[in-house]
Amino acid sequence: MVWQCVEAGLVDGRKIFVDSSLVDADASNNSVIDTRSLRVQLQEGYKKLEARLEEKSESTDSTRRYVKENRRYISTTDPDAAIVNRGRPKLSYQVHRAVDGRSEVITATEATPGDINEAHEMIPLLESHHLNTGIKANTVVADSKYGTVENFLACHDRGVEAHMPDLQESTAKRIEKLNIFPEERFEYDGESDTYRCPAGNRLKPRSLHKSRQSRDYAASQKVCAACQIRKQCTRNKSGRTIKRHLREEELDGMREASRSAKAKRDIKMRQHLMERSYARGTWYGFDRARWRGLWRVQIQEYLVSAVQNIQVLLRYGSYLKTSPSVMMEQIKRAMTRDIRSFLDYAELMSSKIVQSVLFRFIYRRLSFIEG
């Protein structure tokens, strides 16, 4: 369906808007258990279970992308759903979308458990957009949740402009409210590879963190302890530490571009565009999971996105020049082909129940066209 929108000239493809939204899981909070309370029972049968696992093949489900790690609370009804506490705790999934700005076609979408950090999904959406449209985006627009160091550098390496607020700036504003000097008050000297603090003291390079690709800069503890403005700088007994990324120059360039007037216009436009996309999705029940399990929620999101793209195609595309009966037949054939190919990929063609549920769902959603 995305490719049909591309062929109809409804997708520009060079600029995409990214955001996420929560989807209520089809499970009650009463189904949630505390895994710590089961630790005693699990330890009793651990040896027997370990013996069984050694006999099993190691590659039982190597294609599963999201693995529940150290999750304390799990729903017995829908283990893939996660508790998200935004206002009040709820079992949720999370839907991530990339939307093209020309006609608001959804070019890429992904469903994850609700506790997945949405910043981790930006680059996969960018790559899916390229795969689905055949067009490489040169600009990605998102909110501050996506403005991480990893995303800025990933966009830099791909030659993509990142129009999104820097997450560190949001943190700096919170620090300023505590009457603590932000990192911007510390001047970096490239020749000596040192920082100068607001009191005029030098912060020299200390430890190197290879995993974070950053280096710590700090003055001696004696210098910090004797500083007259220490209370405005830090409350740490060891003194103030500044972290500098090994690719700080590239990061500074990306951050500077994200503050441009063009970027600010795109960020403002993104808010309304993505709200419209998800608001239209509520007409087709995207905000409530009809089935349980991550792969089923993913299918639901594919279908809802397909219906929304069909609406765009009917409103602006070449289908408007076709008679209603021919138009409906073309859409049904296209949707049937797409769903069957997806079912083949998921190895679900043997399940007649799944096929019938999917076809009834999509045709019911398309019934408004015939009316």
Predicted region positions:
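Anion-binding and metal-coordination hotspots
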Residues: 1-371
